Design a protein with these regions (language model features):
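A generic alpha-helix signature
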Residues: 1-3, 149-156
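Juxta-kinase regulatory segment immediately upstream of eukaryotic protein kinase catalytic domains
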Residues: 1-19
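Short intrinsically disordered, low-complexity coil segments enriched in acidic
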Residues: 2-4, 76, 140-141, 167-170
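Residues that form generic nucleotide/phosphate-binding pockets
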Residues: 7, 108, 135-139, 154-164
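Short Pro/Gly-enriched beta-strand edge/turn motifs at strand-loop
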Residues: 12-18, 58, 154-164
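ATP-binding pocket architecture of kinase catalytic cores
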Residues: 21-142, 146-150
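Protein kinase catalytic-loop region centered on the HRD/HxD motif
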Residues: 115, 163-169
Length: 170
């Protein structure tokens, strides 16, 4: 099995010899900035992580829908464990940035959840951040995590947020 850097550098989508540069971020994948023929791309290499509810085919399907409604950059190339998208020069928003930009961010999220859902094609899995919270809480509980005493309180907060969000149209 190839290492992620080697995998990223030998993809058939490149028209020239490329030298991927590691990009920080990605909890379950390796990210690289790749320049090919004067264009920059982001290459993500990572296998499915079922324990974290990360299934790459689902990410790619949802990504294509997001691309179709103008929310994300264009997907250039995919394989089961690889995603190459156009690079957007910018910065990752931190909590303070999100707070400041919330009035601009929320309409984009709403747009994707309305128009993006109609753009989905093929099989997809549902995603609920609240389900993820419950899943992780059970994993931490079963592992006798140091966070175990906090889990009930955290799940109560998550349930309050889920109630505030209300039913999600799919």
């Amino acid at each position: 099995m190839m290492e992620p850097l080697e995998r990223a550098s030998t993809l058939p989508c490149w028209s020239t010899t490329v030298t991927p540069v590691p990009l920080s971020g990605g909890l379950s994948n390796h990210n690289f900035v790749v320049e090919d023929n004067g264009q920059k791309y982001v290459c993500r290499v990572g296998a499915d992580q079922p324990i974290h509810n990360v299934l790459r085919f689902n990410e790619q399907s949802v990504g294509r829908a997001a691309e179709a409604v103008g929310v994300t950059p264009r997907q250039i190339y995919t394989e089961p464990d690889v995603l190459v998208i156009e690079f957007i020069d910018g910065k990752t928003l931190g909590p303070k940035d999100v707070s400041i930009e919330l009035d601009r961010i929320l309409p984009r999220i709403k747009h994707f959840h309305e128009a993006g859902m109609r753009a989905l094609r093929g099989p997809i899995l549902g995603f609920s951040v609240f389900h993820i919270h419950r899943h992780y809480a059970k994993l931490l509980h079963d592992a006798n995590s140091r966070m175990r005493p906090e889990l009930e309180r955290l799940i109560e907060i998550s349930e309050e947020l889920e109630t505030a969000v209300g039913p999600v149209k799919v």
